[in-house]
Design a protein with these regions (language model features):
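Hydrolase active-site cap/lid region
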Residues: 262-318, 336
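N-terminal cap/lid segment of alpha/beta-hydrolase-fold proteins
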Residues: 77, 81, 120, 126-170
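Short beta-strand element of the alpha/beta-hydrolase
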Residues: 171-182
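Short beta-strand/loop motif that positions the catalytic acidic residue
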Residues: 334-335, 340-342
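Conserved alpha/beta-hydrolase "acid-adjacent" motif
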Residues: 347-353
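Catalytic histidine-centered segment of alpha/beta-hydrolase-like enzymes
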Residues: 372-385
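Alpha/beta-hydrolase fold nucleophile elbow
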Residues: 239-251
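Alpha/beta-hydrolase active-site loop
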Residues: 189, 196, 218-239
């Protein structure tokens, strides 16, 4: 990394460190009209978190929203989702399977956005349950269809979707990508995007990260043990080559990917850490700045706080520092190969975390978009292009499949 950029980063974090802790506050949210306009704009350009949602459907839902009430938001998007779900059931009953599959997929996306970014109201909790139901209908129509796996674990269970490529058998087991959902995405999103891996003969096992979805517990030191247990399970499946496994984490889940690369390095061929927090992200000085970013659509603090299971800003700021890989004395340890990805202008996770990880421990590879925001995305490098041109080829190489 150029010395000038390092110096700039150091200076920036010096400013954060000197910022008075007493001034910690959350920036005011968008007004309802601002939120509606920004939501529609993102739908129009197929941008996160509305990727795959039709602009016309966004307009229909937003037309019914008059306030920032979470249940009103959930109900408006759910009504649009329900129309797709009803049509999909009718199409399936009539034997129009492709039409049904497309309808269930749209219902899943819309119900899931109804609960976005976290199901923190009764209406959003209902929307999440409906999203899971719609996705289950979609999943059973996929070819090959994924299997919902439930692994007993510490009196609870780890719930994940395992999708195996066609033609796999014990004599030629498939390599696997362990995909971990992020702060506001869910494991089902990764199943939806698994086709690129399946076509290459790569299996996927998709899990929610701690503190989200159906994960068995909140995010804390040691929560990575759920993924270690998942790797144990993978090793019992004859269809999977447990010696060829890569873990993929995007945004918050990049943290778990990085940690697994260290603590499970003997069992991993590699780890993708795309926009993942490492150390600086967890410091109060960064959070008091980043919680006000307009890069995030809305409700960033409730989403982040729910990962830890805390309610107040003070609790949240006090909880975070212990999660740092530097504070846990892990960052300098040997690791499995890592691909670090992010954008220079990420306002959600500091680019300094990528720099810190890159220059610690084992040798790593990095891809940084100089014009990129969170996870590296920009107009020239949307999410899909980063995956297709950067992440997927790297994973294939680590699994011995070339590009």
């Amino acid at each position: 990394m150029p010395i000038a950029r390092r110096a700039a980063l150091a200076a920036a974090f010096a400013v954060f460190v000197l910022a008075p802790f007493a001034r910690a506050q959350i920036a005011p949210p968008r007004t309802v009209e601002e939120l509606k306009a920004e939501t529609q704009a993102r739908a129009d350009r197929n941008a996160y978190p509305l990727i795959g949602i039709k602009p016309a459907d966004a307009r229909a839902a937003l037309a019914e929203i008059k306030t920032l009430d979470r249940d009103e938001w959930a109900a408006a998007w759910s009504r649009v989702a329900a129309r797709y779900e009803t049509d999909a059931k009718a199409a399936e009953a009539a034997g129009r399977i492709d039409e049904a599959k497309a309808g269930y997929l749209m219902a899943w996306r819309l119900y899931s956005f109804a609960r976005w970014p976290t199901p923190n109201s009764p209406g959003k909790q209902t929307a999440y349950a409906q999203a899971l139901e719609a996705f289950a209908h979609y999943a059973r129509l996929l070819d090959p269809a994924p299997t919902l796996v439930r692994i007993p674990f510490e009196g609870k269970e780890i719930v994940g979707w395992l999708r195996l490529p066609k033609g796999g058998h014990a004599g030629a087991p498939a390599p696997l990508v362990l995909t971990i959902s992020a702060l506001d995405s869910r494991k089902e999103d990764n199943v939806e995007r698994s086709e690129a891996f399946i076509r290459r003969g790569i299996a996927t096992f998709s899990l929610d990260m701690p503190g989200t979805g159906q994960a068995p517990f909140k995010g804390d030191i040691g929560s990575e043990r759920m993924f270690s247990r998942a790797l144990d399970y993978v090793a019992t499946r004859p269809e999977i080559d447990a010696k060829r496994v890569v873990v993929q984490g995007v945004s918050w889940s990049g943290y778990w990917s990085a940690k697994l690369a260290i603590v499970e390095r003997e069992r991993l061929r590699g780890a993708v850490v795309q926009g993942g927090p490492i150390h600086y992200y967890f410091q109060p000085e960064w959070q008091t700045k980043a919680l006000g970013t307009r890069e995030y659509l809305f409700d960033l603090f409730p989403a982040r706080a729910s990962v830890y299971g805390v309610a107040t800003l003070d609790e949240f700021l006090a909880y975070g520092p212990r999660m740092s890989l530097k504070a846990q004395a892990l960052i300098d340890n040997p690791s499995a190969p890592m691909l670090l990805v992010n954008g220079e202008h990420d306002s959600q996770v500091p680019i300094a975390d990528l720099d810190l990880m890159l220059h610690a421990g084992s040798a790593k590879e990095a891809w940084v978009n100089p014009a990129g925001a969170h996870t590296g995305r920009s107009a020239d490098w949307p999410d899909g292009k980063i995956f297709a041109k950067v992440v997927a080829p790297w994973i294939a190489r680590q699994l011995g499949l070339g590009e």
